[in-house]
């Protein structure tokens, strides 16, 4: 009788510990366990935007070098698929701000929002071949500086409400 009660109590304790543990036994964990995420190579995030020219930066953010960033718009809908992929991804060229990466000229994006960032001006030069027609106006000197300053000012005067769809 005592042995039976001891077995029942021991079984109940074991099952309780198993139920309350948050190990990778029954949860959706990466291959190799939770610590294996830091060992995994980051893949390029999904393409998005017009013509697939952009890359996802978050579930509702799509940025392209030439087009800027789309936040909460139809161009960023494909980025919601990233939530269902098992491996982590990374977009952008260099780190900026607090946990973000440079997404376009003067724009730093994290997975939640985008802000104007002066340190994101370097490294975004569109390279075109001589044979390739360009539909963009090439700005140099004062005109470029003025345009970038206007983008920065527009970014600092935005409201905190990030629920509205925006194009940067």
Curated annotation (Swiss-Prot):
PROSITE patterns given in the database record: NEUROHYPOPHYS_HORM
Q: Name one Pfam family in it.
A: Hormone_5
Domain of life the protein comes from: Eukaryota
- Show which residues constitute the signal peptide: 1-23
Location in the cell: Secreted
Give the matching SUPFAM superfamilies: Neurophysin II (SSF49606)
Q: Recall the GO molecular function terms of this protein's record.
A: neurohypophyseal hormone activity; protein kinase activity; V1A vasopressin receptor binding; V1B vasopressin receptor binding
Q: Kindly list the GO CC terms recorded for this protein.
A: dendrite; extracellular region; extracellular space; neuronal dense core vesicle
| One GO BP | positive regulation of cytosolic calcium ion concentration
List where the protein spans the membrane: none
Disulfide feature: 24-29, 45-89, 48-62, 56-79, 63-69, 96-108, 102-120, 109-114
Q: Which InterPro entries match?
A: Neurhyp_horm (IPR000981), Neurhyp_horm_dom_sf (IPR036387), Neurohypophysial_hormone_CS (IPR022423)
Marked site (Important for agonist activity on V1aR/AVPR1A) residue numbers = 32
Q: List-wise, which residues carry Glycine amide?
A: 32
| Record key words, sorted | Amidation, Cleavage on pair of basic residues, Disulfide bond, Glycoprotein, Hormone, Secreted, Signal, Vasoactive, Vasoconstrictor
Which residues are modified by glycosylation? 135
Q: Which family does it belong to?
A: Belongs to the vasopressin/oxytocin family.
What is the annotated role of this protein in its UniProt record?
Neurophysin 2 specifically binds vasopressin.
Question: Self-association or partners: how does it assemble?
Answer: Interacts with vasopressin receptors V1bR/AVPR1B (Ki=85 pM), V1aR/AVPR1A (Ki=0.6 nM) and V2R/AVPR2 (Ki=4.9 nM). Interacts with oxytocin receptor (OXTR) (Ki=110 nM).
What name appears for this protein in its UniProt entry?
Vasopressin-neurophysin 2-copeptin
């Amino acid at each position: 009788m005592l042995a039976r009660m001891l077995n029942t109590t021991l079984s109940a304790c074991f099952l309780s510990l198993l139920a309350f543990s948050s190990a990778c036994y029954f949860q959706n964990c990466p291959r190799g366990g939770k610590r294996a995420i830091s060992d995994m190579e980051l893949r390029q995030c999904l393409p998005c935007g017009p013509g697939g020219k952009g890359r996802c930066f978050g579930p509702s953010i799509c940025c392209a070098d030439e087009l800027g960033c789309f936040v909460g718009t139809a161009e960023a809908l494909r980025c919601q698929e990233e939530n269902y992929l098992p491996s982590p991804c990374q977009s952008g060229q260099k780190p900026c701000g607090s946990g973000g990466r440079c997404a376009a000229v003067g724009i730093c994006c994290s997975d939640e929002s985008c802000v104007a960032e002066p340190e994101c001006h370097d490294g975004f030069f569109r390279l075109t071949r001589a044979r390739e027609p360009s539909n963009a106006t090439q700005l140099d000197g004062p005109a470029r500086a003025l345009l970038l300053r206007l983008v920065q000012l527009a970014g600092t005067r935005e409201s905190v409400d990030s629920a509205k769809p925006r194009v940067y």
